[in-house]
Amino acid sequence: MKSLKVALIGSGAVGTSFLYAAMSRGLASEYMVIDINEKSQVGNVFDLQDAVPSSPQYSKVIAGDYKQLKDYDFIFIGAGRPQKQGGETRLQLLEGNVEIMKNIAKAVKESGFKGITLIASNPVDIMAYTYLKVTGFEPNKVIGSGTLLDSARLKFAIAEKYGMSSRDVQAYVLGEHGDSSVSIISSAKIAGLPLKHFSKASDIEKEFAEIDHFIRRRAYEIIERKGATFYGIGEATAEVAELILRDTKEVRVVASLINGQYGAKDVMFGTPCVLGRNGVEKILEIELSATEKAGLDKSIQVLKDNIKLAKL
């Protein structure tokens, strides 16, 4: 079996949470950290090296640069400024972070890298689209974390509401990873059964609205309380990396380039995708209610309007 190499660009809280989770899963034989801040880069490498003896697989953790990426299989990008406390939206990060992403994309392209890239920098759908356009890489090999974490929050909220395990919940959030995202309640299920089977509420729509409100406010509440979110996205993206590198063909909600699905083209947003060694191997278009479709159309338009601001 080929030894795998995973690189991290941006050694902030999100990036290092991803790498630590990846190491805990024994994903690779070598991990490389790239960061413009050498002090932080080396400090995080030292800290992660100390975790190697307790990890399930022996691995090397090194500080490196873009020139070394040619030999790597997988890149995770977490670089960029995070949201500020006080209710800053992800889209408000666009102006500064898009220039950072353009520079990263150029450097990765020049390195000769041929593997798969997973991006979590916000606003993630536009950052992933920017990276795709600047690099010119195959669309299936450029993936945004999209509404992966939103969907995990939805599953958690449903499980908590009905006293079930989140592993038995099948539910998705589509569209922008942001305020215009759409919770797909119409097809949500627990152990194959619709949610109404478990609800005792007289007004089930109100109950669903409360769940939706919870997941929309979750990130803002975490940021207000501790300054940033990173454990949830770190674990979720490490799982995506594992599904890809182990070629499992499992479905997760990530952002991929849309080409006709949901009536949209040339935009990236969260939707269920089959993941394997080629990255996104299939984009799944799930059935939506009229209200959900209208919400997704609005979310797509929000993304398209903001893509123009990226000046690609």
Swiss-Prot record:
Pathway: Fermentation; pyruvate fermentation to lactate; (S)-lactate from pyruvate: step 1/1. Belongs to the LDH/MDH superfamily. LDH family. Pfam families: Ldh_1_C (PF02866), Ldh_1_N (PF00056). It is an enzyme of class 1 (oxidoreductase). Catalyzes the conversion of lactate to pyruvate. GO terms for biological process: glycolytic process; lactate metabolic process. The modification Phosphotyrosine is found at residue 220. This is L-lactate dehydrogenase. Homotetramer. SUPFAM superfamilies: LDH C-terminal domain-like, NAD(P)-binding Rossmann-fold domains. It comes from Mycoplasma pneumoniae (strain ATCC 29342 / M129 / Subtype 1). Its main location: cytoplasm.
